[in-house]
């Protein structure tokens, strides 16, 4: 079955270009030009990924992202202008998985989309643990004391990457390559913001983490200390 991408952008020419590129790569696409309507479209179309512009009529992309994240783990990639530095951070904190700066090359966009859609349906049985958090990898399930912790697919991938090598300290660049699929230097804020989001969900006390630890000046590792 072809995967469906929802393009949320009020720039008709850009939306048309994205549709042509994505359909050429084998994806189904739908286009919405209004933020409020995008929320309805996600519920009705159940897309596999959302390409979300920050500046939208009706409701801006940051608010759309925040509302979607309240009850959906659908991957979200923001489309943003180079001047939107503050908004990029706000978007990531609101739940976006990645972002791409305009103007961008079609190949770069497709690579980001494919990286967020990667899933292996034939994963072997694998159980991991960090501190008191248990991870059932093929079931994409995280629990503490039998209670399930709801993570987005990207947050789950980040936790698994750390848990698989509990003694390794990961630099932000390494995590960008392993979790986001980047093959070139990129913005390490992606990692920092997602670690904060992950800690807010898996730590008993995010200010004193025992699951995802910071190694000052280097990066992150799995806990406990």
UniProtKB/Swiss-Prot annotation:
The chain residues annotated with the modification 4-aspartylphosphate are 53
Question: PANTHER family attached here?
Answer: DNA-BINDING DUAL MASTER TRANSCRIPTIONAL REGULATOR RPAA, REGULATOR OF RPOS
Q: Which SMART domains match?
A: REC (SM00448), Trans_reg_C (SM00862)
Q: How is it modified after translation?
A: Phosphorylated by MtrB.
Please give the function described in this protein's UniProt entry.
Answer: Member of the two-component regulatory system MtrA/MtrB.
Protein name (Swiss-Prot/TrEMBL): DNA-binding response regulator MtrA
| Ranges where the Response regulatory domain occurs | 4-117
A single BP term in Gene Ontology = positive regulation of DNA-templated transcription
Please list which residues make up the signal peptide: none
Q: Name one GO cellular component term.
A: protein-DNA complex
- MF annotations from Gene Ontology: phosphorelay response regulator activity; transcription cis-regulatory region binding
């Amino acid at each position: 079955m072809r995967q469906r991408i929802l393009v949320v952008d009020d720039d008709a020419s850009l939306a048309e270009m994205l549709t042509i590129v994505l359909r050429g790569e084998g994806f189904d696409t739908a286009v919405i030009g209004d933020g409020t309507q995008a929320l309805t479209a996600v519920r009705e179309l159940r897309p596999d990924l959302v390409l979300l512009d920050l500046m939208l009529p009706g409701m801006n992309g940051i608010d759309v992202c925040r509302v979607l994240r309240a009850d959906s783990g659908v991957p979200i990639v923001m489309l943003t202008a180079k001047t939107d530095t503050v908004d990029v951070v706000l978007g990531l904190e609101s739940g976006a998985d990645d972002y791409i700066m305009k103007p961008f090359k079609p190949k770069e966009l497709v690579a980001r989309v494919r990286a967020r859609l990667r899933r292996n349906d034939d994963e072997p049985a694998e159980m991991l643990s960090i501190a008191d958090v248990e991870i059932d990898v093929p079931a994409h399930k995280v629990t503490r004391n039998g209670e399930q912790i709801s993570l987005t697919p990207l947050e789950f991938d980040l936790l698994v990457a750390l848990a698989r090598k509990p003694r390794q300290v990961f630099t932000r660049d390494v995590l960008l390559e392993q979790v986001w699929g980047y093959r070139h230097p990129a913005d390490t804020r992606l990692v920092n913001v997602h670690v904060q989001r992950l800690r807010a969900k898996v730590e008993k006390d995010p200010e004193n983490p025992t699951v995802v630890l910071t190694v000052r000046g280097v990066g992150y590792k799995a806990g406990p200390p």
